[in-house]
Every structure is written in structure tokens, then in C-alpha cells.
């Protein structure tokens, strides 16, 4: 049935092209492909319209677009005009039509391709003239259906109009500019038809006279066919076919099921029946045995699976190397820079931030200080979708050497400069820009990253520079480069005395930094209560107009931010202090755990709704009681290679009454160079990795005798390190020659399990990242400013069975070994003391002499005295040598 035509304003008459006469054997074309086999499109010329009184906009209009035509009139037109008649294509249809009148409909919108169409069945004519009435429910249902329904219109051939594209094609096409010369070569006419004479010829006398086909082994007979076990089942093939039927008359209907139940009489009869009692008595023993088995062990465990996992983890050596996935280089930087710090975005997958600094020594930096002021110091945000253009560029007053995302809100970033200032950024206004990056996609679709050749970089994208919103005070902050920065956990806060209090705000509000000026500073980003109220006139004088593109989140800190407290590491009796380079707090391991990423995402969504950093209030530490059982000790790595375990709490000097730092709890000089990595294990809170100089050490908090593991000197100096995020016994160490040493404590504890070359220059930073359960990456930065993204293989990312317990058992053995060594050291010292006392006793030991021995000794002493006296007198000339007699006689 043809649907009713829509009521629209008339567009006027259309000029129709002349149609060639159809051949006698041409089949009429109907609209069966569109679901209307009874409709046959026609082209009626103006002459035909006048003959049959169906002129457009006169006889047939929008209100009455159809006309009933007598069958005999059509036959008369066919006899008069023959093949020229417009009804000639449907002549066969008209002859087979059972009725006397055919329905001709004006197709104003060319729905079926021509200006008229003929309905060739009585049923179709009745449905068009008398459409079935639609119920009211169906009318209401149709009101909600959009009227703009797509109507298929077959393409109509049109004459080609030149718009100049053929000239471009002719210019790009290659044509021959010179005329070709044709040569025809043939034999002499006299040689045609000459007799042919064949003779023998030596094949070796003429070069290339023959082609030799030497024998060779056919590889088809040497290939080994592998056998494969394939299970087959003889069953008939099943094909799933589904159809979708339109619900013409929808109605609300509900269905409810309920179980069939026994009546009270049947229940009582069944309870007292003997078959039920016998069944319960027989089945109770089997059920009890099954329950006991479930309590004792898991009967459904797959033993073969666990055996295969151990073998596959340590036996599969085909995929053990890091594979380079992508690399990023700042091609727009005019100067040569190195990467100083790397950090993956906590919530947006595929986004990584790096800080860059100029590769200059201290003397060169002072010499070129004027030129360096003209170049921006940046933190670059790279995305996997565009390896050439950074997504964001954070500007800072000077080169950044360390930065961290805020755990409560990833849009807040804190960084430390080379001049000792702390810089704060707020990228909340640009969060939508970096969240809609192609590589990251939606957060629900992150199974695998797309390869590089499927990503389309935005070549015309302009760089987005973001200015910092606050910097610390130059006079009251650090005096030298800031080497490390950390956010304190959102569960606690400290005051100027170092006492720990509960953090009621629920967000991270404090920072800790260490610098080469021998200080460790704690900072609070909340506004501090002024001691004296300021007048409104003074506030107006101090107010500074900020640019419109700089958020006012930390406006109260800009150029007036002072540290909450300072900690100095004294060297004891001397006036010198230790120079810290890296620190590790007790709460740092919480930020490294992989399961905290979902928590970070929920915190991000909450921060977007409430914006807690836009309405910061001063701390409540003065109103709360301090937490006494909180561990305030932390590890510090120094520039001289020392590892110090100290306390951040301050104490008063009994003589001066000033606040001073406590003495370090323990102090060890293990490394022969600057400590640049000190990090807690993400699996063990009390295990710390330190890297510095030419060796690596692993410590346990609470063990003051020394490190659990200390490596021997490496062939090249170590420059960076990081724990694995999924394997407790694996950590990565970067070297100055571009190699990465991969340590696996389950395989080797005295040397790296493997070493792999990554670049040709020094590796400056290492940062792993978990993308999914099947894919992990490790970001490696080098001295030339290139960021290498490496894919971690399966053997280094998937932990083996009971690996955590095995590594923990290894650490416990090392602790016992240290205790044994300490005991042996004390015993040996005691033995040495006893041996020294024994030797001293032997030296001063006196013997008891007899009376005869004492008289003999006195006599010998007296005789030696007389001999000496005689010699002196002879020398003085008092007696002569020739004189005989004893000296006693002379006397």
C-alpha cells in the first residue's frame, strides 16, 4: 500500500526530459525493492496529461493527488500513439488488470523516481482510496514518532557540469612530450622461403647456449608436520536466526510467577511419612562428609594450573626484554634540555608529564643567565595520540627539578625550582581538554592502547601555555635547588613543632621539600591567620591585579608563602649540616599502590563538584589533640652518599629555649656518591630502596645495624631507580651509559638478572605505570631530553605464585643474618678484650725468687759496678794499667 503524501507547499512545475520509446520486450519496473510491488512509476508528458485530464496543479493537486482512468481510454491511446504512448511500458500490466478503472497517483516529491505512478492491483487501489482507520492509541503513538523519516530516492542521471577539476587532473597526469619514432625490422626478402639446414653444435663452445637444470632437494619432503589435537563432535549444524517484528498496538502487560505449595494437611502428612525419614537418614551422612571436605580443603582446585604457572613464569625466556612502545621529544625547544622528573597522570590513562631543564653547569648557567631568562621553563604534558605536540605546557619562574600531582585532586600540581621556590599550578580549567584525548579514550574502554599507525595527531593544534598561580617567597624559602617534593597524606597534618594531628578537611593540604641548602621544609597551602588585623587601606595597596587566565586558587600564597617549619640535619659536634637530596616518608607507599587509582578517580570527581581547594580554610591543629602513636621518623639520602633515619619533630634547646631538630636515629655511609633515589616498596611498608653512586642498597625500617642488601660496584654509575608495581622482588636501575639493570631477587641477589640498552646517554629518571592487568609501561627519561615509553614483558609484570611470601622470607633471613653478624661482632670484640688482658698479664707477670738467686744477682751487679769504676779511673789517669793488684787494695 502506498502511504499518504505529506502536505507541503507546491514547488511549481518541473521540466521533464523527453523519454525514449521503450522496446516491445521491455519489462515494466515496479517498486518491489521498496516493499510496494503493486506500484509502477510512470513519466507522463504534458500532452498525455491533457489527454487524460490529469494536469499537474489543475486536475491533480496536493489535496487530491490521484485520478481514476478508464482502461479503455488507455487502450485507445495505445492504438493511436503506439510506442510513443507514455503507457506503453505498462501495457502488459494494464491488459492483466482485472478492473475497469486504474488508479493514477501524482508523485510530487518523486518518491519513486518519476512524476506519476500506477497502482496495478485492486487491493492497493482500495487501500489508497479508503485507508484503514487507526485507533486512538495508535494515533497517540504516532505523535511521538519523528516525522523526518528517511525516504530512499534513487539517483537520477544528470549532465556533467565542468567546475575545473579536469584541468587539475590533466596537469597532474604525465604525457609524452616528444613524438615517438617507430622502427620496423625484418629480414631480407631474398631469405624468405630458404631451405632450413640443421647441424650439431657444441653447447660448451658458445656462452649461454643452454640452461642447466641441476637437481636439488625438494623441501616439501623435509618439512616436519606438527600434530595438533582437535576435538570434534558429530552434531547437526545449528543456525541462530532472529527477526524483529514491529509492535503495532503496544499495551501494558505484567506476568507474575509463584511456586506451587503444599497445603497444611499435605505438609503434616509428608513430615510423618516413612520414605522421607529414610531418605534423610541415608543422605545426612553423605552431606556431612561433603561439608567436612569443603571445610578442610578446596575440592575444586586445579593442581595442574598451579604447576604450569610456576613453569611458565621462570621457564619462558622468549619475552623478557623491554620493548619500546613510543618516544617523545620536544622538537620546538630552541635549546638543549634534559628531563629532570617524570610523573604519569593519576587518572587519565596515556597522559604523562615531564619537567625539562637546560643542560648547563653552574658556571655556564651563571654566564648565560641573561639568555636563560628569555626562555620559558616548562612542564610538558605528552599524550600517546600525539608524539610531536605537547597537550599542555606549564610555565614556571625557573627550571623545575621535581614535581608531584596532588593525590586529592590531580588538577593541582606542585613543583620545586632550581632557585629554591615552590610553584603551584591549577589546571582545572583545562581538565576537559586533556580528558578528551584520543589515546586515553573513555575511562570505561581501556583494555589495550591503539598502535601508533592508527592514531591521528592533530597537526594544527596550538600549544597551550598555562601560567603558575602561586610561587613561594624567595627570602623565606630554600636558598638552593629543590631536589625532592612530597604531598603529605590527607589523613594527618603537622604544626610548627612537628606534632601530628588529624586532618579534618579530608584533602592533602601540606607539602614537604628538601633542598641542597641543608634544610627540609614543611609547607601548608591553606591561608594562615594573621597575628594582627590589617586595615582595608593597606589591603588595597597590596592588592595586585592578576591576569584573567590565571586561576585565583592559591592567590593568598603568591610571593608570601613561608614554610611551616624547617628541619636541619646536624652532623653532631661540628657546626656543619647534612645536605639532603631525597626523602621518604612513612605514608609514601600508599600513593604507589595500584588499587588506589580508583580512589583517586573518585576523589577527582568529588573535587570537580565541590572544588575544595577554592575555599581553603586555616588548619585546626591548634584545636585538636596530637596523635601520640604516630611514627614521625623518615629516611633521608644525602649528597655525600649517607642514608639517615631521623625525626621531624622539633625539641627545645635547654640552654637557649629555641626550637631545634633532633639528632638522627641512625646514620650509615653506604653509597659512594649522591643518593638520588630513596623509595619505599609498594608491597612492604618497612622496606626501602636506595640508589646512589655505584651501588644499590635495600633497608628495613627498624633495623639500625645496616642494609639488608648492598650490591657491589657497578661498571657504570647508577643514576635512577624504581620498584616494580606488580612484582615484589623486581626493581629497575638506570645507569649513566643508557642501560637499565633489572634486578629480580627471586633469581639473583648479588647481581642484576639482566641488563638492556635503552639509549646512548645517561638515564635521568624511571617511572613505571600500570595500564591494565595485561599491559604495563615504564617511562625512561634521558639526558638529551627524550622520553622513552617501554612496554614491560609478561615475565616482569606478572608475579609468580607466593612471590610476596618468598621475598618477605628472604628479607627475614637477611634480618636474622644481620642480627647474627652483630652478635658475632660483639662476641669478637669481647674476645679481643680478653686476649689483650691476657697479653698484658703475661708482660707484667712476676716470679718468686730464692735467697741464693737474689745474692748472686747482687754480687753480679756489684762486680759490674767495680769494672765500670776502674775504667773511669784509668781514663782519668788516677791509676795505671800496668799496676798489679786489685783495686780494693789501693782503696
Swiss-Prot record:
Main subcellular location: cytoplasm
Q: Which residues form a coiled coil?
A: 818-861
Q: Does the keyword Coiled coil apply?
A: yes
Q: What induces it?
A: Up-regulated at the transcriptional level by TP53.
One cellular component (GO) term of this entry: axonemal dynein complex
Give GO terms for biological process.
Answer: cilium movement involved in cell motility; inner dynein arm assembly; negative regulation of Arp2/3 complex-mediated actin nucleation; negative regulation of cell migration; positive regulation of osteoblast differentiation
Subcellular location(s) per record: Cytoplasm
Q: What's this protein's name? A: Dynein axonemal intermediate chain 3
Q: Which organism is it from?
A: Homo sapiens (Human)
Amino acid at each position: 500500500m502506498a502511504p499518504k503524501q505529506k502536505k507541503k507547499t507546491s514547488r511549481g512545475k518541473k521540466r521533464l526530459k523527453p523519454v525514449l520509446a521503450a522496446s516491445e520486450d521491455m519489462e515494466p519496473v515496479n517498486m518491489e525493492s521498496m516493499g510496494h510491488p503493486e506500484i509502477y512509476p510512470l513519466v507522463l508528458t504534458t500532452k498525455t496529461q491533457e489527454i487524460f485530464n490529469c494536469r499537474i496543479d489543475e486536475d491533480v493537486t496536493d489535496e487530491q493527488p490521484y485520478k481514476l482512468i478508464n482502461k479503455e481510454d488507455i487502450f485507445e491511446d495505445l492504438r493511436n500513439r503506439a510506442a510513443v504512448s507514455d503507457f506503453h511500458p505498462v501495457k502488459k500490466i494494464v491488459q492483466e488488470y482485472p478492473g475497469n478503472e486504474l488508479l493514477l497517483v501524482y508523485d510530487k516529491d518523486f518518491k519513486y523516481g518519476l512524476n506519476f505512478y500506477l497502482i496495478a492491483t485492486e487491493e492497493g487501489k482500495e487501500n489508497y482510496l479508503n485507508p484503514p482507520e487507526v485507533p486512538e492509541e495508535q494515533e497517540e503513538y504516532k505523535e511521538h514518532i519523528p516525522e523526518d523519516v528517511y525516504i530512499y530516492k534513487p539517483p537520477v542521471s544528470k549532465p556533467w557540469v565542468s567546475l575545473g577539476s579536469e584541468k587539475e587532473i590533466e596537469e597532474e597526469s604525465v604525457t609524452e612530450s616528444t613524438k615517438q619514432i617507430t622502427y620496423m625490422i625484418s629480414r631480407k626478402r631474398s631469405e624468405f622461403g630458404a631451405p632450413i639446414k640443421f647441424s650439431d653444435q657444441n653447447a660448451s663452445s658458445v656462452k649461454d647456449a643452454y640452461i642447466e637444470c641441476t637437481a636439488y632437494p625438494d623441501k616439501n619432503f623435509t618439512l616436519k608436520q606438527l600434530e595438533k589435537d582437535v576435538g570434534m563432535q558429530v552434531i547437526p549444524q545449528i543456525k541462530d536466526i532472529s527477526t524483529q517484528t514491529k509492535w503495532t498496538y503496544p499495551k501494558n502487560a505484567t506476568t507474575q510467577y509463584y511456586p506451587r505449595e503444599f497445603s497444611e494437611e499435605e505438609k503434616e502428612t509428608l513430615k510423618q511419612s516413612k520414605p522421607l525419614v529414610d531418605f534423610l537418614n541415608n543422605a545426612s551422612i553423605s552431606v556431612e562428609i561433603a561439608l567436612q571436605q569443603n571445610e578442610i580443603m578446596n575440592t575444586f582446585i586445579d593442581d595442574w594450573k598451579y604447576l604450569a604457572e610456576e613453569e611458565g613464569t621462570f621457564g619462558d625466556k622468549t619475552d623478557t626484554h623491554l620493548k619500546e612502545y613510543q618516544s617523545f621529544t620536544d622538537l620546538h625547544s630552541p635549546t638543549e634540555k634534559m628531563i629532570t622528573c617524570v610523573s604519569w597522570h593519576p587518572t587519565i590513562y596515556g597522559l604523562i608529564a615531564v619537567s625539562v631543564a637546560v643542560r648547563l653547569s653552574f658556571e655556564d648557567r651563571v654566564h648565560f643567565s641573561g639568555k636563560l631568562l628569555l626562555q620559558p621553563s616548562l612542564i610538558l604534558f605528552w599524550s600517546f595520540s600525539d608524539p610531536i605536540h605537547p597537550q599542555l605546557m606549564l610555565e614556571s619562574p625557573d627550571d623545575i627539578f621535581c614535581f608531584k600531582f596532588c593525590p586529592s585532586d590531580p588538577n593541582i600540581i606542585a613543583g620545586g625550582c632550581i632557585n629554591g621556590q615552590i610553584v603551584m599550578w591549577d589546571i582545572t580549567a583545562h581538565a576537559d581538554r586533556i580528558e578528551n584525548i584520543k589515546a586515553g579514550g573513555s575511562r570505561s574502554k581501556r583494555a589495550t592502547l591503539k598502535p601508533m599507525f592508527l592514531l591521528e595527531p592533530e597537526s594544527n593544534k596550538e600549544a597551550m601555555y598555562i601560567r603558575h598561580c602561586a610561587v613561594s617567597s624567595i627570602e623565606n624559602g630554600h636558598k638552593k635547588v629543590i631536589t625532592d617534593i612530597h604531598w603529605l597524606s590527607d589523613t594527618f597534618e603537622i604544626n610548627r613543632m612537628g606534632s601530628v594531628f588529624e586532618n579534618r578537611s579530608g584533602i592533602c593540604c601540606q607539602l614537604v621539600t628538601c633542598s641542597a641548602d641543608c634544610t627540609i621544609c614543611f609547607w601548608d597551602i591553606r591561608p594562615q591567620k594573621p597575628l594582627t588585623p590589617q586595615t582595608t587601606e593597606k589591603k588595597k595597596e597590596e592588592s595586585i591585579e592578576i591576569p584573567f587566565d590565571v586561576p585565583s586558587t592559591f592567590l593568598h600564597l603568591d610571593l608570601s608563602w613561608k614554610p611551616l617549619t624547617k628541619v636541619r640535619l646536624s652532623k653532631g659536634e661540628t657546626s656543619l649540616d647534612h645536605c639532603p637530596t631525597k626523602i621518604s616518608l612513612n605514608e609514601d607507599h600508599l600513593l604507589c599502590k595500584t588499587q588506589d587509582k580508583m580512589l583517586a578517580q573518585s576523589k577527582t570527581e568529588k573535587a570537580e563538584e565541590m572544588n575544595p581547594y577554592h575555599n581553603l580554610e586555616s588548619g585546626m591543629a591548634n584545636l585538636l589533640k596530637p596523635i601520640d602513636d604516630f611514627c614521625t621518623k623518615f629516611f633521608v639520602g644525602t649528597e655525600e652518599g649517607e642514608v639517615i633515619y631521623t625525626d621531624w619533630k622539633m625539641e627545645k634547646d635547654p640552654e637557649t629555649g629555641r626550637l631545634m631538630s633532633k639528632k638522627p636515629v641512625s646514620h650509615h655511609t653506604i653509597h659512594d656518591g649522591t643518593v638520588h633515589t630513596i623509595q619505599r616498596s609498594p608491597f612492604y611498608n618497612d622496606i626501602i630502596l636506595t640508589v646512589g653512586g655505584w651501588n644499590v642498597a635495600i633497608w628495613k625500617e627498624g633495623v639500625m645495624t645496616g642494609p639488608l642488601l648492598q650490591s657491589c660496584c657497578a661498571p657504570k654509575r647508577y643514576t635512577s631507580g624504581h620498584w616494580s608495581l606488580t612484582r615484589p622482588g623486581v626493581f629497575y636501575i638506570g645507569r649513566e651509559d643508557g642501560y637499565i639493570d633489572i634486578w629480580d631477587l627471586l633469581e639473583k641477589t648479588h647481581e642484576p638478572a639482566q641488563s638492556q640498552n635503552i639509549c646512548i646517554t645517561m638515564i635521568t629518571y624511571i617511572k613505571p605505570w600500570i595500564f591494565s592487568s595485561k599491559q604495563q609501561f615504564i617511562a625512561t627519561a634521558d639526558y638529551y631530553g627524550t622520553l622513552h615509553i617501554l612496554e614491560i614483558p609478561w615475565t616482569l609484570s606478572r608475579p609468580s605464585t607466593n612471590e610476596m611470601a618468598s621475598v618477605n622470607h628472604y628479607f627475614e633471613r637477611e634480618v636474622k643474618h644481620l642480627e647474627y653478624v652483630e652478635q658475632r661482632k660483639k662476641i669478637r670484640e669481647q674476645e679481643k678484650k680478653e686476649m689483650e688482658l691476657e697479653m698484658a698479664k703475661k708482660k707484667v707477670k712476676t716470679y718468686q725468687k730464692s735467697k741464693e738467686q737474689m745474692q748472686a744477682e747482687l754480687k753480679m751487679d756489684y762486680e759490674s759496678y767495680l769494672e765500670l769504676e776502674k775504667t773511669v779511673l784509668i781514663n782519668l789517669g788516677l791509676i795505671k794499667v800496668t799496676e798489679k793488684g786489685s783495686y780494693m787494695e789501693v782503696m
